[in-house]
């Protein structure tokens, strides 16, 4: 199952709101192993593999090939409420892994068109779908006892037994709105983090969320360019509630939670690390998004975290704009206001108050044979998103890049080759140069799905006032 994406696999993609902006992917291989993905298409295809649904799949290999079956309950999906007849975008595909990767589909894709969902066939019907309350209750009981041995040899000294009772609630209020709640959540059965090497890293490592309460409906909180809600900063919640949904062109999300072990990311332009507040905090996050035109979006997000003598509040506006079927603009403006606690002031040398802004733009063109991009970021020195992930602040950055691909016949030894190159330059807010980077690589694809890549990176970097030249080459 871990290599399902590299297998011969049948894929069903459904755009249940027919908004041509997001959808659900369901993958099944010949042995019936399954995978599911929540995808978005507001700026090209983007996949979120952390999404999980409960559904059934089966597969059988026969003399002519193989057959797969999928049984997806409606409660695993979200779709419009109060409509007599629904229209869903859909595509059925097969990744046919042979000497060359073929993708077979019920419809053809124009690779000069950046969006994929807008090219899907439409399925009309579902007039008899009844909205169920769809209540899921998951009680938990956790017991813990620590025994100690004071002398060797000797007997164990039995410790006290600590018992905690918890409850998770998932309530489908309607077909397009879900309420989640949790009391003393038990995350002991959640899969562990992937091993990350944190040696010689100046900026904090990003870890993916794995906890079910935070994963359900997580896509409703996502903004265009900044990660304003990084739920891994909420380490030990005892109470939490969340409402997510979509009605017509309007999507909304609201989350409230407390935290007994609050972690805060403290960034600079030279590095970042987490600070523990050692006190209980309350957290809130909300987002509203409106689907603008055929493909675009505009949204407003806010997060707030507070304790007795501390608060951090962030307000942001963002969106995507499609000039045509291949050219898009992403933008985001954000403002943060912080009052630091005495603990943070004394232990991390912070001022009593911090307030600043952040801006970002990204312009891209995606065509079949080439792509271009330009980006700009301006992050203030005192900009902090204590519920989000902003590992670097106090900088201004510009970047340009692009690439081109040449396609050859599928029977040739070399089926395609491409190049990509980019340049970016970063300054501190006081004007000092932080980094200038040039990067380029060549990629060759051939038979047996073989890939050969060669690349070079030149980086001129300022670290604590000292400049370093880095020249990196790689072959893959």
Where are the language model's segments positioned?
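Outer-membrane beta-barrel translocator domains and adjoining extracellular loop/strand segments
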Residues: 39-41, 103-105, 149-154, 193-196, ...
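Exposed, low-structure sequence patches enriched in small/polar residues
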Residues: 236, 335-476
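Membrane-embedded beta-strands of outer-membrane beta-barrel proteins
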Residues: 68, 137, 167, 241, ...
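Repeated loop/turn-to-beta-strand initiation elements of outer-membrane beta-barrel proteins
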Residues: 135, 177-179, 249-254, 294-299, ...
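Residue-level signature of outer-membrane beta-barrel architecture
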Residues: 72, 171, 245-247, 289-292, ...
């Amino acid at each position: 199952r871990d290599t399902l994406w590299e297998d011969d696999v049948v894929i069903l993609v459904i755009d249940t709101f027919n908004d041509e902006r997001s959808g659900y992917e369901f993958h099944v291989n010949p042995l019936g192993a399954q995978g599911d993905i929540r995808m978005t298409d507001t700026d090209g295809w983007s996949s979120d593999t952390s999404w999980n649904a409960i559904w059934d799949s089966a597969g059988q290999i026969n003399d002519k090939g193989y057959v797969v079956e999928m049984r997806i309950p409606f409660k695993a999906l979200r779709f419009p409420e109060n409509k007599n007849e629904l229209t869903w975008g859909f595509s059925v595909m097969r990744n046919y892994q042979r000497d060359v990767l073929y993708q077979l589909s019920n419809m053809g894709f124009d690779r000069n068109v950046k969006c994929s969902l807008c090219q899907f066939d439409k399925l009309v019907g579902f007039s008899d779908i009844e909205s169920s309350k769809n209540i899921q209750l998951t009680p938990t009981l956790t017991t813990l006892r620590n025994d100690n041995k004071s002398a060797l040899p000797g007997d164990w000294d039995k410790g006290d037994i600590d018992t905690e009772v918890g409850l998770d609630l998932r309530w489908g209020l309607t077909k397009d709105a879900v309420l989640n709640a949790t009391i003393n959540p038990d995350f002991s059965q959640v899969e562990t983090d992937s091993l990350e090497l944190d040696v010689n890293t100046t900026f904090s490592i990003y870890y993916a969320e794995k906890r079910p309460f935070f994963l359900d409906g997580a896509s409703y909180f996502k903004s265009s360019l900044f990660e304003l809600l990084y739920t891994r900063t909420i380490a030990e919640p005892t109470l939490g509630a969340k409402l997510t949904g979509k009605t017509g062109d309007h999507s909304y999300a609201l989350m409230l939670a407390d935290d007994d072990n609050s972690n805060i990311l403290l960034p600079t332009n030279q590095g970042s690390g987490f600070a523990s507040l050692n006190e209980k905090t309350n957290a809130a996050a909300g987002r509203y998004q409106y689907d603008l035109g055929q493909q675009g979006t505009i949204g407003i997000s806010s997060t707030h975290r507070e304790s007795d003598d501390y608060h951090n509040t962030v307000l942001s506006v963002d969106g995507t704009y499609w000039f045509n079927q291949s050219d898009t603009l992403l933008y985001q403006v954000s403002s943060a206001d912080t009052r630091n606690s005495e603990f943070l002031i004394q232990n991390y040398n912070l001022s009593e108050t911090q307030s600043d802004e952040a801006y970002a733009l990204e312009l891209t063109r995606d065509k079949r044979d080439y792509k271009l991009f330009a980006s700009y970021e301006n992050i203030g020195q005192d900009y902090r998103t204590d519920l989000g992930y902003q590992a670097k602040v106090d900088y201004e950055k510009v970047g340009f890049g692009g690439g081109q691909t040449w396609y050859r016949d599928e029977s040739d030894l070399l089926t395609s080759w491409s190049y990509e190159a980019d340049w970016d330059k970063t300054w501190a807010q006081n004007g000092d140069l932080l980094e200038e980077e040039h990067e380029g690589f060549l990629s060759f694809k051939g038979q047996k799905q073989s890939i050969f890549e060669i690349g070079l990176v030149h980086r001129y970097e300022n670290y604590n006032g000292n400049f370093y030249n880095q020249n990196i080459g790689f072959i893959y």
